[in-house]
Each structure stands twice: as C-alpha cells, then as structure tokens.
From Swiss-Prot:
3',5'-cyclic GMP binds at residues 97, 116, 169-172, 176. Residues 860-862 form a propeptide. This is Cone cGMP-specific 3',5'-cyclic phosphodiesterase subunit alpha'. Keywords: Cell membrane, cGMP, cGMP-binding, Hydrolase, Lipoprotein, Membrane, Metal-binding, Methylation, Nucleotide-binding, Prenylation, Repeat, Sensory transduction, Vision. Residues 486-819 form the PDEase domain. The keyword Lyase does not apply. A lipid is attached at residue 859 (S-geranylgeranyl cysteine). It comes from Gallus gallus. As cone-specific cGMP phosphodiesterase, it plays an essential role in light detection and cone phototransduction by rapidly decreasing intracellular levels of cGMP. Binds 2 divalent metal cations per subunit. Site 1 may preferentially bind zinc ions, while site 2 has a preference for magnesium and/or manganese ions. GO terms for biological process: cAMP-mediated signaling; visual perception. A divalent metal cation 2 binds at residue 603. The gene is PDE6C. The active site is at 562 (proton donor).
Length: 862
C-alpha cells in the first residue's frame, strides 16, 4: 500500500464530508479539542465560526461564560464584554456594541456603554466612560428604534433604513454596512440594546447568524437582568433607609423647618450616592408690606419682574445649606446668598423654583441654557459634572425649597431611579413641613390665647377701686398702699364690711336674693367663707379673697337667668346644705372650701343657651369640648382665674392640697350637667339606703368619710340640688325665678327659629308660653322630686327643700289644671262652632236654595 500524504487525506475528507463527520465525532478526543479552544479572549483565532465548532467546543465556551457570570466579583460590563467577544468570533462579524437604556427627566434614551468590541479588543478600550457617552433619544438611530419597538432587527443595508444615524460613524471614523440589533428586556422595561456590525465574508447576516445571536444573547440578558435586579434592590434599600432615618429626624425636630431639613438631610447623606448636594430655602412671603409697595406706586422703584413660583411668590432664596461629601465632609450654611453664588449662578435652582420641574442634566458644564461653572467651584478643586435638581413641595403644593444633587459617585449620570428615590425624599420633606407649620400655628394660637386671656383678665379682673369698695383699707387704716397693711388688720376691716348672715337668712333654705343688690351679694359670698372657717385656717389673703369674689361676679354675663344671682344662689345653697343640712360632717374643711368656691363658679360665663344649642350652631366651645360643653368651659374659666396669683384663693396650699381642690372643682362643676344626673342618682340612692340602716351617726360618718368615691357621688348630687334649688324656694320667689328661666329658654328658641331655621321644642317655644305650668309639673315629677326626696331621707334637716318643692308643685299643678280646663272649654266651643258651621253648610247644600228653615219662600205644599 502506497504512502498516504497530507494532500490526499485532505482531498478525501473534502469529497466525503459524511465520513469525516462520523470519524471526528467517534475518534477525536475531548482533550485535544479542549486544548484548542480553551484560550483567553486575546488568543482566539480569527475565522473560527459556529459551523467549525463541535458541541464539545460549544459546551466549553458556555461553561466559561457561566463561570464568569457566577463570579460575583466580575462587573456586569466585563461579563458582557467577554460574551460579545465570543459572539464576534462565532458570527464572523467585525464588531459588537451595547447601548444601555435609561430615562432622564421622564424621557427614555440610549447611551453607549460598550463600543466596537472585537475578539481581540481590550475591555478598557471598549468601555465608554460616563463623561464620554454618546446619548440618543429613542427617535434617532437604530438603537433607539429597537428600544422603542422592543423588536429584533436584521438590517442588510443600513443606508436603506430610515432610522439609521451616521453620527457615531462620523465620530469614530467607522463605516457601518449591515447589522443585527436586539433589545434586552425585563418585563416591559428595556435594559439594553446589543448590536452586531458588519458581517465578514458575506453581504449580510444569515438566519443561522440570527439563531446564534439570539442564543448567546440569553447570557447577556441573564447578566443584565441580574444586575438590574440587584440595582433595584439597592435603590429600594436606599429609599427605605432614607425614609426611615429622615422620618426619625423629622419628628425629632418640630420647631423649625431649617433644623428639620438639616437634620434629615445630614443623617441620610450616605444613602444619596452623590458627591455634593445643596438645599435652597425659599422665602414664603406672598405679599409685601404696604410700605414696601409705596416706592413702586410712586414710581421711585421698578416693580419686580423676576421669576416667581407657581403660587406667585418672588423667587428669593434666603438660605442655602451646602453638604460636601467628597474628601473631608463639611457643611456650609450661607444665609442670604448672593446671586453669583456657585449654587445659584447657573440659574437651575431658580428655574426649578419657578416651574416646579425635575431637572436631570448629564453634562452640566456643556449645557447652553444654564451657565454652570466650568472650573472648580471652590478651593477643593471640585467640579460639576452632572446635576439633579428637584423642588421641595409642601401639602399645599407650595414650593418651599429646591434640593440639588451633584455628581453621582460612580461617575454615571443620575437616572430615573435616582430621580424617583430623591423625589420620594423631597416629597416627604415637603410634607413634613406640615409639622413645623402646625407647630408654628400652635405657638401663634397659644400666644393669641395668652393675649386674649390677658385682655379678658384686664376686663374681668376686679380693679383696685372695685376691691377698695369692699376692702376699705385707705379709709380705715389711713394708708396709701395695701402693701403697707398687716394681714390681720385687713381681715378685721373686711369682716366689718360683711353682712350678718342671720339678717339675710344665709343659713336658710328659703333665702331670697331679690332684696340684696348684686354688690351686696359679693359681700355675702365672702361672709360664707368666713362662716365655714376657712379664710384664716388656709391663710387666704383678704385682698385676694375680695378680688376673686368680685372677679367671679364680673365673670357672669348679664343674661336673663344664668347670671351672677343664680351663681350666688347655688353657692349659698351649697353652704346651707353643708351647715344647716349638716352634710359638712362628712367632709374636711378643705373639701368644704373647694365645694363652696366651685358652686359660686359653676355657671361662670354662661351664654344663655344650652349644650345642644352649642352643638347645633357649631360654636367653638362645641368643637373644643366633646361632652358637657358648657360645664367644661365653666371649669376651664374657673381654673384660669386660679392661675393668676392675685386671684388664687388657694395660693397658700401645698401642691397635693391644690391638686385635690382642682379635682373637686372638676367633679362639682361637671356634675351640674343634667345629662349625667341619671347616671349618678342610682348610686346616691344606694348610699342613702345604706345610711338609713345604720344605728349611729358615727357609723354613717365613717361609712362615707373614708370612701372618696361616696363623697364625690354625694357632692355631685349636692351640686344638682343646688343648681335646681330655685324650684324649692317659697312660691313668691319660685314663680318669679321660673319666669326668668322660661324667658331665657324662649330667647334660645327665638335664636333657633331665626338663626338655625329650626322649630324649637315646646319648652323653648315662646308661642307655647301658656304651657309653662304643665312643663313645670313635668320637670318636678321627672327630675326634681327624686333629688330632694332622697336628700330628705339622707338628712332630715334638708326636708324643708322637699316641702318647698311639693308646695310649688301644688301651685303649678293648680295653674296647669286651670289651663287644661280653659283649653277644654275653648276646644268644646270650637267644636260646637265647627259642628254648627258644618250643619249650616249641609242644609244649604241639601235645601235646594231654600231659606234657613229648609222651606221654600215661594211655594207652599198643601
């Protein structure tokens, strides 16, 4: 057999391709092929195509790519670069490129990331740095069109394609003939566009090339999706941390917007991913003072023609806070910044404040609209590269400031995710302004309240002259100032001016205030405190007691019934229940002191209308207090008086005693709300039942006095008894008081009819005034009888009140019956008249026009 040479073998294999394939598949060892193809990208042999590669070779390449993907240390760009190198080799194309898709200012775009990748090119040469990017909107270039349509394109001749742009060819000196382009997507979002340019040894890319291209693009897709998911995770992590920490600091500082912004922005600096950022705070003044307008109106000054915010304010940054994060961290605060400050000179913050737009600029110094400083802005040598500026908008949609962020740390321009995360931050900061605004409003309201209280005190508080009309120290002690007087002398001369309680029947349940002047009632009130022996025991200054009593009298409005006379009567009845009714034995002197004082104050500043009217009319008191509206107002008014040291009759008590007094004031005054009466009367009845079964007085005293709750229940019922006590007075007094009460109710009814456009209930309807006796009987039976009957059981000394109530019921019942009889007669008369009229009408209709007797006047029936 002859020698077989190389040429003969090669010729045989070419003529018998099926044999060659079977032989190589069966005989060629994997180690040999592996040694051929396991080479670095730089050593890849030119011209090796997918056709020339076995499955084993393909597996080796795929394994290598998977190894690169698995290596977490490798960057996304490096892995994609290696994949594109393999594709360049396999597809026999001249080069590959990758464009990254992103959005800025809400506009999508594509930017060069890997350019002109060949099987032997270096990564550093192919990677496009952020400052050298070429950016296309989606309506220019094939890459943009692919990103827009999200479709694969195989273009045999780019010059015949309407979307082709030769901008990059001119910039790089390259000539593009044909290409394949495919989008890399995640869901509906386009992440990148990969392009294969200029098929070698052919005029266009084949169907087989398309399959290979799409096949290996799965690796790039996997890498990009993994990178994008990681990036989104980082974004959300930063967003949550920013919101968490900014919320923490925002709610730490509620007093001042500058401190609030500063604390929040400084705390989250590590999550902002930028080299520097600044916050410009805008002046919130909408209207100039009138004296600032005068020069303009007189023509001495030009009106403002500069930029204004959307709500019409002049754009005026009153402060800039500059946060430097590169190099040594530093914070600069620039109050009243000049117009040529580097933060403002570009005009970008002013533009954002004027229009409220988000501005994202990738190459700021080259921008033609804004004049950014091209060189270093300060001594640190730092220069502006890219900028993201956003308005800070509060809940009223007013722009309160502008936040500007400079130079993303990785050198890339800010993208849509940076916009979103920082917009979330600025929105939160804008909304948090509500906290400081609310705090400021609360402060103003508090200050207004203090001023109003001061004005009220000035008008209500007893003047020195009024105090001197009772406490005549100048006349009797021959001094110019009360400070010169000894307290014992003041007590002595005060007692001399007070009436004798027996002369005025202050100890009697039948006491009437009608013979006494309102000024005289003030001295009577002071006398009651001396009678329960609390003035000297608790060291109440004579001047303070006199001023407080006079001020309480002035605190009552001049209305029909709930005036000072009613207030005094309730205080006198409380005194009588304690002393004459002998209930004082259950209470300490301090408690008795507080109870009488609270009784005097219980209706102070009453408006002449009830709680229901306050709610119907949406009065401020109804908004301030949810329940027992007027009673809580009387309580707050009383406490306000005690806050003034010159009116505080409890000023010499210790802290615990004073707290006890305030608590008793609350229980006593709130208890006058009749809506609470039905809740407490069962409890009071049980106490009375228990007392009746006790054999000795000492046992009863112990049963009540050691239990604060029982004492409070009794005190609450005492306040109800005092408040309604006018109905127990002698008939001559009670009938007059009842008319005053009715008149006040009718006045409220008139208001309901005219102001609220509502029909009042019968008790408040002036047109039903004749029903007053009937209403009084119903009120006595439904409310009053239980109170005084139980008190007469509780202490027989209180029986005169129950007797007075019963006598008055007889009087009202008599008048109610008379009214009923009168109404019955009227109804019967009215009924007769109606029947007569009906009969007359019937006769007229049925008589055929006859006379009154139903007979014809012209015809006689024989």
């Amino acid at each position: 057999m002859g020698e077989v040479n190389k040429d003969a073998v090669e010729k045989y294999l070419e003529n018998n391709p099926q044999f060659a394939k079977e032989y190589f598949d069966r005989k060629m060892r994997a180690e040999v092929l592996g040694s051929i193809f396991q080479v670095s990208p730089g050593d890849v042999k030119e011209g090796v195509s997918f056709k020339d590669m076995s499955r084993l070779e393909e597996c080796n390449i795929l394994f290598e790519l998977l190894t690169e993907i698995q290596d977490e240390a490798g960057s996304m760009e490096k892995i994609v670069h290696k994949t594109l190198q393999r594709l360049s080799q396999l597809l026999a194309r001249d080069r590959c490129s990758m464009f990254i898709c992103r959005s800025r200012n809400g506009i999508p775009e594509v930017a060069t990331r890997l350019l002109n990748v060949t099987p032997t090119s270096k990564f550093e040469d192919n990677l496009v740095n952020p400052d050298k990017e070429t950016v296309f909107p989606l309506d220019i270039g094939i890459a943009g069109w692919v990103a827009h349509t999200k479709k694969f394109f195989n273009i045999p001749d780019v010059k015949k394609n309407n979307h082709f742009s030769d901008y990059l060819d001119k910039k790089t000196g390259y000539t593009t003939v044909n290409m394949m382009a495919i989008p890399i997507t995640q869901g509906k979002e386009v992440l990148a566009v990969v392009m294969a340019l200029n098929k070698l040894n052919a005029s266009e890319f084949s169907k087989e090339d398309e399959e290979v291209f799409k096949k290996y693009l799965n690796f790039i897709s996997l890498v990009l999706r993994n990178h994008h998911t990681s990036y989104l995770y980082n974004i959300e992590s930063r967003r949550s941390q920013m919101l968490l920490w900014s919320a923490n600091k925002v709610f730490e500082e509620l007093t001042d917007i500058e401190r609030q912004f500063h604390k929040a922005l400084y705390t989250i600096r590590m999550y902002l991913n930028c080299e520097r950022y600044s916050v410009g705070l805008l002046d919130m003044t909408k209207e100039k003072e009138f004296y600032d307008e005068w020069p303009i109106r007189l023509g001495e000054a030009e009106p403002y023609k500069g930029p204004k915010t959307p709500d019409g304010r002049e754009v005026n940054f009153y402060k800039i806070i500059d946060y430097i994060l590169h190099g040594k961290e530093e914070i600069k605060v620039i109050p009243t910044p000049p117009a040529d400050h580097w933060c403002l000179i570009s005009g970008l913050p002013t533009y954002v404040a004027e229009n409220g737009f988000i501005c994202n600029m990738m190459n700021a110094p080259a921008d033609e609209y804004f004049t950014f400083q091209k060189g270093p802005v300060d001594e640190t040598g730092w220069v502006i590269k890219n900028v993201l500026s956003l308005p800070i908008v509060n809940k009223k949609e007013e722009i309160v400031g502008v936040a500007t962020f400079y130079n993303r740390k990785d050198g890339k321009p800010f993208d849509e995710y940076d916009e979103q995360i920082i917009e979330t931050l600025t929105q939160f900061l804008g909304w948090s302004v509500l906290n400081t605004d609310t705090y400021d409003k609360m402060n103003k309201l508090e200050n207004r309240k203090d001023i109003a209280q001061e004005m009220l005190m000035y008008q209500t508080k007893a003047t020195p002259t009024e105090v001197e009309s009772i406490l005549k120290y100048k006349e009797k002690l021959n001094v110019k100032s009360i400070e010169e007087c000894d307290e014992k002398d003041l007590i002595r001369i005060l007692k001399e001016e007070l009436p004798d309680p027996k002369d005025l029947e202050l100890y009697e349940f039948r006491f009437s205030d009608f013979p006494v002047t309102e000024h005289g009632l003030i001295t009577c009130g002071i006398r009651l405190f001396f009678e329960i022996n609390v003035v000297e025991k608790f060291k109440v200054p004579a001047e303070v007691l006199t001023r407080w009593m006079y001020t309480v009298r002035k605190g009552y409005r001049d209305i029909t019934y709930h005036n000072w006379r009613h207030g005094f009567n309730v205080g006198q009845t409380m005194f009588t229940l304690l002393m004459t009714g002998r209930i004082k034995k259950y209470y300490t002197d301090l408690e008795a002191f507080a109870m009488v004082a609270a009784a005097f104050c219980h209706d102070i500043d009453h408006r002449g209308t009830n709680n229901l009217y306050q709610m119907k009319s949406a009065a401020p008191l109804a908004k301030l207090h949810g329940s027992s509206i007027l009673e809580r107002h009387h309580l707050e008014y009383s406490k306000t008086l005690l806050q003034d040291e010159s009116l505080n009759i409890f000023q010499n008590l210790n802290k615990r005693q004073f707290e006890t007094v305030l608590h008793l004031f609350e229980v006593a005054i709130i208890a006058t709300d009749l809506a609470l009466y039905f809740k407490k009367r069962t409890m009071f009845q049980k106490i009375v039942d228990a007392i009746e079964k006790m054999e000795t007085e000492e046992e009863a005293i112990k049963y009540i006095s050691i239990d604060p709750t029982k004492k409070e229940v009794i005190m609450a019922m005492m306040m109800t008894g005092c408040d309604l006590s006018a109905i127990t007075k002698p008939w001559e007094v009670q009938s007059k008081v009842a008319l005053m009460v009715a008149n006040e109710f009718w006045e409220q009814g008139d208001l309901e009819r005219t102001v609220l456009q509502q029909q009042p209930i019968p008790m408040m309807d002036r047109n039903k005034g004749d029903e007053l006796p009937k209403l009084q009987v119903g009120f006595i039976d439904f409310v009053c009888t239980f109170v005084y009957k139980e008190f007469s059981r509780f202490h027989k000394e209180i029986t005169p009140m129950f007797d007075g109530l019963q006598n008055n019921r007889v009087e009202w019942k008599t008048r109610a019956d008379e009214y009923e009889e009168k109404m019955k007669v009227i109804e019967e008369q009215k009924k007769k008249e109606e029947e007569a009229a009906a009969k007359k009408a019937e006769n007229a209709a049925g008589g055929g026009g006859g006379g009154e007797d139903g007979k014809s006047k012209t015809c006689i029936v024989l």
